[in-house]
Amino acid sequence: MSNIKKVTSTELAGKDVNDIVSLVDTVYKKNGLHTELELQFIQLKINADPALTRAAKVNPESLYLSILQAAESGLSLNPQWQEGYFVPYNMKIDGKDVPTVIFSPMYRGKKKLLISKEIVKNITTELVYDGEFFDENIINGIHTITHKPDSFNRENPAKIVGGYAIITLNSGEPQYVVKGREYFERCKKQSENK
């Protein structure tokens, strides 16, 4: 975390989103983000989602912490970049459900962080559709994937049979993760339930 002082709910009471964003302005600038643009993205998201609007009003400290976390990560809330977003949650605090704003990095944001922190060189992901050639082998501890996509047969999401990621470590060594359709359906269902 940065050296910005902790702000309490009492100090945040009555402050609007502009005031809260101004508290982390230096963090945005340090990470190369434009505070004014990020403020617009935050306002658009909060105004478009009644649950986020309520959480920001009831629990402004959670909004502040989420904005601070987004700014410190260097991830933008620009919906076109798909690096991160705010999610409304009901958190149990002292036995009560309290509407809370949570910052959540998206896939592209996580990839950006891993590459920028030099944890990995690259991450490539691909979906596999019904009818495409896909072969996964592990021979003498060496993992390989052969996939021949059919670019003309990728319109229908119902035909997705799985997907994979190739993570290239800084050493140049590839790591593979392969998941079936059921995994993606579970992820989708979990995200819809939040």
Feature annotation, model-predicted:
Residues 1-28:
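Glycine- and charge-rich intrinsically disordered segments
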